[in-house]
Amino acid sequence: MAKNFLIELGTEELPPTALRSLAEAFASNFEAELKAADLAHQGVKWYATPRRLALKVAELAESQADKVVEKRGPAVSAAFDADGNPTKAAQGWARGNGITVEQAERLKTDKGEWLLHKEEVKGKPVQELVVDFAAKALAGLPIPKAMRWGNSDIQFIRPVKTLTILLGDELIEGSILGVSSARTLRGHRFMGESEFTIDSADQYPAILEERGKVMADYDARKAIILADSEKAAAAVGGKADLEDDLVEEVTSLVEWPVVLTAKFEEEFLKVPSEALVYTMKGDQKYFPVYDENKKLLPNFIFVSNIESKEPRHVIEGNEKVVRPRLADAEFFFNTDRKRPLIDRLPELEQAIFQKQLGTIKDKTDRITELAGYIAEQIGADVEKSQRAGLLAKCDLMTSMVFEFTDTQGVMGMHYATHDGEDEQVALALYEQYMPRFAGDDLPSTDISASVAMADKLDTLVGIFGIGQAPKGSDPFALRRAALGVLRIIVEKEYNLDLVDLVAKAQSLFGDKLSNANVATDVIDFMLGRFRAWYQDEGFSVDIIQAVLARRPTKPADFDKRVKAVSHFRELDAAESLAAANKRVGNILAKFDGELAQEIDLALLQEDAEKALAEKVEILAEALEPVFAAGNYQEALSRLAELREPVDAFFDNVMVMADDEALKTNRLTLLNKLRNLFLDIADISLLQK
């Protein structure tokens, strides 16, 4: 008979940003143990609050099924000697299985006859298994840094206080992480019963809500927070900023969510909203509220962990907490604006970018020149791009950014606007950091794009130039920087070459760089980011590898090639031509001599090679302007016409002829054929 199974681990406060991943991993690991043990069940559900991780398994079988295990022994031919007596090999095998050779069965196969022992294995009761399964599941959690507590050597992400393991109404005895299983559950710190006992797994999680004032279901808590926050925002005429990461964190901080609305003085709205939002979301875990025009309202929503009889006191307490932070932002904003942003440029000499690469001022000088160079290439205003580059890092020296670091860039934009800088220059100070994460918006103007690329390329070349390419960790966010440059170039269709950009960036460092191969290393690294990007976009690895094999260094051109090869792969001729290209590559790799540039038509003898040569020559001429225009999809569609003449060639022509002139001419034909494809990609790398 199947029963519901429960395990709950009570702990001290777990890290909120890791709670979901810990709970999901616990469930996944435990379910894997059940599967490996062949224990039937109707699903595993995880529960998580700041002070507990729990699993409930529906309809868990009470024991493993009995099964017959077949143990094959030596072949009959090796099990008996010429007189029919068991050999030592047979006797040893039988002894190891607790039988005699005479008791062994025979197994006949196409490859011969073997000794066989069928052993009945009784399934173990689940009570003997689950404690070990849970211990293994917990040991496999993604814990970046474990801790010890008390005098024990036991380590876990946080000290463990309680353990409950139930199968139906039966308490499973056992110990995990130094705590023995018991029926005791802990309720909310400030509401309900602080401790109580549970009689059956069937009571979970309802008993926690009823007696402990704890909502163990993570997704249910999150749903309440979302729904009630939307209602609360609507009640003040706005819409809440319910960013998922913050909602997840808040969900992980409370066991009994109560959504409340508070307000702050309207005078604070004179401060750029980004600074106010930074302190509300980052410091206090509040949800800002915006009106229909996306302007910040003087309200915020927060989630309390208690159901107070006097919610007004809770609201006032939170208003009292946030008010000084908003006042600080107001003070910094007013103070910073007393000096023009450009006046802070010399102060950048005091800030180190990287010990070997100099100060932020040094970086600013490089960004300024590189932004101007890029602007010239893409037709942007060079003077404005350089002005934006010069001002780009000045806000790092302001009080606001020093206190609220995530406001860098956006405060530069506000201060530049206040100083009367050009609108696009000011905007570039904000957009220089775009894209900040996968899927983020790109810089909206060419000036912004010039500065954004200059900043990222300077960091890439500089850090690679001193031999600090990212391995496991990536402290300078080089992967993000590389992908950012690629996205800007591809999605804005700029005709830029990484070779030129990296060379220009490298030249601006003077003699600071010690890595002689910095240009190659940076370009290879950036091309490697293409693979990750296009895989995320759904392109198969072999398509990306086919293009990477040609190492095209113009990102916009790279994009066209990938999409063209992806389209080509869907054509009927693709598989045959990919195989033919692979065959041609193998043939040419074995040839040590020199090939002519052109096919000698006079040496063509077979009809099949004449037909192929004619088709290759026609396509080579016809596709020249197509290649030049970068219309690779059209080119590959035309090259698909080679399928039949290529197949006929290999069916009817001996490439490696005895006559040296014939052989070399045929190899020249194949080389010219292959080069037509290699002008786009190495399609021989395409898989079936």
UniProtKB/Swiss-Prot annotation:
Subcellular location: Cytoplasm
InterPro entries attached to this UniProt entry: DALR_anticod-bd, Gly-tRNA-synth_bsu, Gly-tRNA-synth_heterodimer
Reaction catalyzed: tRNA(Gly) + glycine + ATP = glycyl-tRNA(Gly) + AMP + diphosphate
SMART domains in alphabetical order: DALR_1
Cellular component GO terms, alphabetical: cytosol
Presence of keyword Transferase: no
Domain of life: Bacteria
Key words of the record: Aminoacyl-tRNA synthetase, ATP-binding, Cytoplasm, Ligase, Nucleotide-binding, Protein biosynthesis
Any one GO BP annotation for this protein: glycyl-tRNA aminoacylation
A Pfam family: DALR_1
PROSITE patterns assigned to the protein according to its UniProt record, in alphabetical order: AA_TRNA_LIGASE_II_GLYAB
GO molecular function: arginine-tRNA ligase activity; ATP binding; glycine-tRNA ligase activity
EC number per UniProt: 6.1.1.14
Main location: cytoplasm
Known partners and oligomeric status: Tetramer of two alpha and two beta subunits.
PANTHER family noted in UniProt: GLYCINE--TRNA LIGASE, CHLOROPLASTIC_MITOCHONDRIAL 2, GLYCYL-TRNA SYNTHETASE
Family: Belongs to the class-II aminoacyl-tRNA synthetase family.
Protein name as catalogued: Glycine--tRNA ligase beta subunit
